[in-house]
Amino acid sequence: MNQEKIMQLEEIINTKYDNITGIIGLKNGVTKYENYFNGGNVNSTVHVASVTKSIISILIGIALDKGYIEKIDQKIIDFFPNYVIKNNNLAIQKITIRDMMTMTVPYKYQEDSYIKYFTSKDWVTFSLNLLGDCGEIGKFQYAPLIGPDILSGILVNTTGRSVFDFATEYLFTPLGIEVKDKITFSSEEEQVAFLKAKDINGWVIDSCGINAAGWGLTLSTGAKMCIRDRSIQHIY
């Protein structure tokens, strides 16, 4: 490897990116580079933000494989029989799991949506209420935080288990990964501290006990590499 380029990379990380704790680089399955930064080490667990969505997608795949979900093109509304559709929202009745996973669904976001989301007790219902009526199904619209929780709701309703327990049995434990706790916040300060921490191990849940699907999971650099390797094995 080009040592000059490596030194430049490390200098940039050490001076500009205090949220990076580790990098592992592989080529043909062989580790070519591994280093840790900003007080991190091989066991440091940090909030992986939107990587959580990829983990949820893997869990949806496992649920499909095990027969909990029949097919990826099922309508999401079918998994929430008690949800009351508001204002004759036709779009929400057409949206599928595939649409959710590919982020090609319309949302009715407003400026204060995030404050209301974080202070609401039921993130799944909150997300369902924002679906449809604005935009078109099939057009990409990135969902930073609000929305993916619907997939968590589907996993809970189909498996009869928490996302945390389902993931622990079928993904984390088989790979030797330990996600310890279900995390809740009692204040904004606690949430901000979580986003910056390098030693918190767990997965955020709402007041209903549903794991966040668009954010909220912590993993170590090694754990992410392990999941990456297993995913590639299944693809090829």
Segments from the language model and where they lie:
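A short, well-structured edge-of-sheet supersecondary motif
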Residues: E10-G40, I72
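Active-site SXXK
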Residues: G29, H47-I72, M100, L151-L155
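Catalytic-site signature segments of enzymes, centered on catalytic residues
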Residues: V42, Q110-E188, I210, W215-L219
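Extended ligand-binding groove/face enriched in aromatic
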Residues: H47-A49, F79, Y83-I137
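Short alpha-helical patches at coil-to-helix transitions and adjacent helical residues
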Residues: V51-S57, K94, P144-P148, T221-K224
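Active-site helix/loop module of the DD-peptidase/beta-lactamase fold
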Residues: K66-V105, N157-I210
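Conserved small/polar residues in nucleotide/adenosyl-binding loops
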Residues: M225-D229
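Acidic, glycine-rich loop-and-strand cores that form catalytic or ligand-binding grooves
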Residues: R230-Y236
